């Protein structure tokens, strides 16, 4: 056998087409890491008997445990159980007690029992049932070869998770071949690109235990730190000095950890200082307010905002002088500064953020192209306005998202400077 450990095989044409994000694989991978189980490969196959069987046979030559999700339902395209049986040349057998349980579960849920549901009562000879407390699709645990075990779960996330926690985790703790306990942390960064961040921490990226790996998404860069130890405490002790060094080198670019968002960090800083916030939005159309109010408890410091899309609303609700709009245009430093000051005065807050830009795809000029955004942060120590150029290649939604991220980060840095 080339490798030990656990592999994940996710079944469903909808996954290959991108209709559904593969959240099951991510969730299982996190649980395997927490159990200290080596996990080196994930595979996705469509609803096809031959390819599914081939994937299972290939996995049997690499790993000790194969976890599958999907394809356990009653419809003709639910092929996992019969394909696995065919892959290892094992006959399917009906389990009368399982069929009785499936019928009882369907009836208890007020659902009609269809003849096709009977397919779910067939398992390969020698397989044991993994009960499904939330649905009609049972899984199985089956060892078709020496030192190779398959655990199957439905694709419905809530059903898969309940079954995994109740049945798979206890079994994996005993038989999975854990090599230690893995602990991971995520550090989040803003205002720095992935390549620049990687240069600053290049030597730490070469570490083996802990490992440090960069990940980038729109407007956000992350470093995942992972360590393996004999216990969670020993693994955490390996992470602590590396995290401290990363924070030292990156200074204010690091804004939080795994569960933090820029909005939650900004709100926490405001609450700590006993200050309040308002927003004035044009090109983001409420995106700033949405990001802030997505954080539970935001009402303690976030007073509200004005979506001032037209010049008339900028004048009427934010007291932006008409001559500023005529002289500089709505997308300009003077206008966003006036918007921020107007919101701060009208809503009676300590701080205010204002944004105005050209999100596209049309409306740009040579002087003010698509992707140009002006941001202003007004606070007790004055108002600062700046321009950002996000370009026109990413599209309207990306410009709006980047504007929200950059505006919140500007406020975060101002709040840190005052503390």
Curated annotation (Swiss-Prot):
Signal peptide: none
SUPFAM superfamilies: CinA-like (SSF142433), Molybdenum cofactor biosynthesis proteins (SSF53218)
Species per Swiss-Prot/TrEMBL record: Parasynechococcus marenigrum (strain WH8102)
Gene3D superfamilies from the UniProt entry: 3.30.70.2860, CinA-like, MoaB/Mog-like domain
InterPro entries noted in UniProt: CinA (IPR050101), CinA-like_C (IPR036653), CinA_C (IPR008136), CinA_KH (IPR041424), Competence-induced_CinA (IPR008135), MoaB/Mog-like_dom_sf (IPR036425), MoaB/Mog_dom (IPR001453)
SMART domains: MoCF_biosynth
Family of this protein: Belongs to the CinA family.
CDD domains in UniProt: cinA (cd00885)
Annotated protein name in UniProt: CinA-like protein
PANTHER family: NICOTINAMIDE-NUCLEOTIDE AMIDOHYDROLASE PNCC, NMN AMIDOHYDROLASE-LIKE PROTEIN YFAY
């Amino acid at each position: 056998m080339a490798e030990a450990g656990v592999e994940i095989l996710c079944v469903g044409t909808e996954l290959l087409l991108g209709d559904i994000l593969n959240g099951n694989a991510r969730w299982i991978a996190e649980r395997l890491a927490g159990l200290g189980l080596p996990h080196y490969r994930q595979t996705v196959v469509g609803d096809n008997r031959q390819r599914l069987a081939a994937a299972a046979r290939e996995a049997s030559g690499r790993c000790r445990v194969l976890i599958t999700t999907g394809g356990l339902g009653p419809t003709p395209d639910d092929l996992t159980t019969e394909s696995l049986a065919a892959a290892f040349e094992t006959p399917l057998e009906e389990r009368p007690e399982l069929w009785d349980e499936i019928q009882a579960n369907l009836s208890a849920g007020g659902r009609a029992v269809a003849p096709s549901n009977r397919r779910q009562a067939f398992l390969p000879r020698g397989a044991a049932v993994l009960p499904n407390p939330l649905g009609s699709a049972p899984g199985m645990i089956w060892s078709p070869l020496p030192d190779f075990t398959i655990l199957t779960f439905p694709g419905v996330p809530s059903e898969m998770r309940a079954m995994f926690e109740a049945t798979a985790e206890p079994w994996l703790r005993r038989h999975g071949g854990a090599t230690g306990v893995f602990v991971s942390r995520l550090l989040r960064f803003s205002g720095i690109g992935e390549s620049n961040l990687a240069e600053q921490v290049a030597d730490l990226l070469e570490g083996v235990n802990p490992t440090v790996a960069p990940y980038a998404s729109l407007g956000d860069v992350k470093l995942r730190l992972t360590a393996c130890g004999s216990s969670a405490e020993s693994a955490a002790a390996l992470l602590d000095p590396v995290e401290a060094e990363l924070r030292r080198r990156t200074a204010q670019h690091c804004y939080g950890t795994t569960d933090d968002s820029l909005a939650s960090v900004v709100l926490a800083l405001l609450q700590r200082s006993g200050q309040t916030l308002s927003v004035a939005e044009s090109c983001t159309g409420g995106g700033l307010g949405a990001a802030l109010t997505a954080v539970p408890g935001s009402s303690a410091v976030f007073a509200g905002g004005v979506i001032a899309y037209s010049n008339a609303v900028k004048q009427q609700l934010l007291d932006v002088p008409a001559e500023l709009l005529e002289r500089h245009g709505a997308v300009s430093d003077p206008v966003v500064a006036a918007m921020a000051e107007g919101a701060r005065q009208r809503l009676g807050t300590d701080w205010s953020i204002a944004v105005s830009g050209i999100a596209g795809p049309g409306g740009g000029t040579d002087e003010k192209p698509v992707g140009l955004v002006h941001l202003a942060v007004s606070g007790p120590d004055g108002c600062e306005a700046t321009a950002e150029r996000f370009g026109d290649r990413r599209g309207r939604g990306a410009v709006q998202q980047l504007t929200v991220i950059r505006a919140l980060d500007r406020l975060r840095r101002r709040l840190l400077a005052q503390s």
